[in-house]
């Protein structure tokens, strides 16, 4: 039998064409070691900083250290099944999380996956968790208020939309309570909220979610939870994930408020990752870039101008500015605000609210130290009526604290000093407020007007809060039109001032104090 060479070549060609081999080019490496959620991978020559890596069983990792002959990656989630010699693939993608209004009312983890047992979240968009903050030209000055509903804050350290206001204090001084009250008070004000819980007990997070649900605040809130049982990587990333979810609203001409509770635990998680990656430690064993860790996060909170919003939405939204207001929380040790992380965050933010253990234990809650709490930009954003009436409050309180220290040693005080001490005691009492009971603008205005004009001076200190509550009920029932006007205009005209004075005097005559 004679074979024709051309037939043989045709036969080989047809067999090759029928094989249908699908070739794939990919960058692949091998796991060298696994320790505490950190994998060292050999290979992956074309990997990017911050790129997502694919480990066996669909486990995701993040490339953080790019070295000469290996890559240091942190595993997001369970890592006990990963072993030496396992293959690792590059995905060519930077870490993203789902964003959009579909997340409102839900509890998610640092990767945007639901953990509240209410089923999947069908978001239409995803966005990068690490983004560059808006530039100088894209920003607009802070000029609109964020009402927290807390007298002590709205009167003395006002917060504006787009501001970063630090809440700092020892453990158990009511830091979370202040932030949660601020979220509750945004109901009906068109501000979307994001609450990021970092390294907290799962029971504490559950309590916050339950309270927000009870008070109807979950409708406009996303909770990003990375509890103490989660890996250090998830705690480190949760703040950036929450920020991206808040930026979705900012970039579309809406207003958003984000609470980071707390950034001390995020810094500790980042320190753990850095030390395991063998990065050189610096002060307090933190890595050299711990300042950048927080600055790049907090700089993303800003008020952006209408041109930025219009450009971002391709002309779909016109004439609206967007804002992301940040309330980072820092926990101090024995009131030491000069430690590394507290000083870093104080220098990044636009002001701070100091909460003190002594005041908290003395029953002054919220336990705000008026002397050293400041708001560097909020004054321009303060509600008109509160700005008019709150000028004397801060001075009265600061002077009272100083005089009270001297008064302990002095036996005979002159009349002016005694009056100032008495006024200070009443102002301190008035600044007390129950948790989950934020006040409306008109309620705050009535209280501030009454204390400024001496209507509390002849009351006993213990009756101040009862008088305030009675006055609010009296105004609501008999002066509803005045209340509505103050609430609508957020200002106090001469006629309204006269009406308010008459209303307070009328109540004082009838009240039994």
Curated annotation (Swiss-Prot):
Question: Which reaction(s) does the protein catalyse, per the Swiss-Prot or TrEMBL entry?
Answer: ATP + H2O + 4 H(+)(in) = ADP + phosphate + 5 H(+)(out)
Listed under subunit, the entry gives: F-type ATPases have 2 components, CF(1) - the catalytic core - and CF(0) - the membrane proton channel. CF(1) has five subunits: alpha(3), beta(3), gamma(1), delta(1), epsilon(1). CF(0) has three main subunits: a(1), b(2) and c(9-12). The alpha and beta chains form an alternating ring which encloses part of the gamma chain. CF(1) is attached to CF(0) by a central stalk formed by the gamma and epsilon chains, while a peripheral stalk is formed by the delta and b chains.
Q: What does this protein do?
A: Produces ATP from ADP in the presence of a proton gradient across the membrane. The alpha chain is a regulatory subunit.
Give the UniProt entry's GO cellular component terms. plasma membrane; proton-transporting ATP synthase complex
Keywords of the record: ATP synthesis, ATP-binding, Cell membrane, CF(1), Hydrogen ion transport, Ion transport, Membrane, Nucleotide-binding, Translocase, Transport
Entry EC number(s): 7.1.2.2
Q: For ATP, which residues are the binding ones?
A: 169-176
Taxonomically, which superkingdom?
Bacteria
Q: Which family does it belong to?
A: Belongs to the ATPase alpha/beta chains family.
One Pfam family, short name: ATP-synt_ab_N
Source organism of this protein record: Polynucleobacter asymbioticus (strain DSM 18221 / CIP 109841 / QLW-P1DMWA-1) (Polynucleobacter necessarius subsp. asymbioticus)
- Topological relation to the membrane, as annotated: Peripheral membrane protein
Q: Which named protein is this?
A: ATP synthase subunit alpha
This protein's major location comes to membrane
Residues at site: Required for activity? 373
Record field: transmembrane: none
Q: Gene3D superfamilies recorded for this chain?
A: 2.40.30.20, ATP synthase alpha/beta chain, C-terminal domain, P-loop containing nucleotide triphosphate hydrolases
Compartments (UniProt record)? Cell membrane
Gene Ontology molecular function, alphabetical: ADP binding; ATP binding; proton-transporting ATP synthase activity, rotational mechanism
